[in-house]
Amino acid sequence: MVPYEYYVVLSGLLMVLGLIGIIIRKNLIAMLLSTELMLNAVNIAFVAFDMKLYDVSGQVFVFFILTIAAAEAAVGLGLIMAIYRLRKDVDVNTLTELKL
């Protein structure tokens, strides 16, 4: 059995990769995917601590986070599609105006 510390390290690495993806990327779709990666890192951390503490509450939180991530992805992709229809671009640097 793999020690839980490895899962915590993996979770931290995924969180850092997601944060780097949000900071470096300027495409809205890549930023949304980086956010999903960060949410999955939190899920891995919850399961790792759940494995260490022999408690099932971490798994319950994982299901809540998965449902929130699915709703966030649906709303985010809908907004990105609406922005693309109006501007023909999803680059963050070009989305500086509030007016159409």
From Swiss-Prot:
It is an enzyme of class 7 (translocase). Keywords: Cell inner membrane, Cell membrane, Membrane, NAD, Quinone, Translocase, Transmembrane, Transmembrane helix, Transport, Ubiquinone. GO terms for cellular component: NADH dehydrogenase complex; plasma membrane. The chain crosses the membrane at residues 4-24, 29-49, 60-80. It comes from the Bacteria. The keyword Transferase does not apply. InterPro entries: NADH_UbQ_OxRdtase_chain4L/K (IPR001133), NUOK/Mnh_C1-like (IPR039428). One of its GO terms (biological process) is ATP synthesis coupled electron transport. GO terms for molecular function: NADH:ubiquinone reductase (non-electrogenic) activity; quinone binding. Its EC number is 7.1.1.-. It holds the Pfam family Oxidored_q2. It catalyses: a quinone + NADH + 5 H(+)(in) = a quinol + NAD(+) + 4 H(+)(out). It is a multi-pass membrane protein. The keyword Cell membrane applies. It is found in: Cell inner membrane. NDH-1 shuttles electrons from NADH, via FMN and iron-sulfur (Fe-S) centers, to quinones in the respiratory chain. The immediate electron acceptor for the enzyme in this species is believed to be ubiquinone. Couples the redox reaction to proton translocation (for every two electrons transferred, four hydrogen ions are translocated across the cytoplasmic membrane), and thus conserves the redox energy in a proton gradient. NDH-1 is composed of 14 different subunits. Subunits NuoA, H, J, K, L, M, N constitute the membrane sector of the complex. Belongs to the complex I subunit 4L family. This is NADH-quinone oxidoreductase subunit K. It comes from Persephonella marina (strain DSM 14350 / EX-H1). The gene is nuoK.
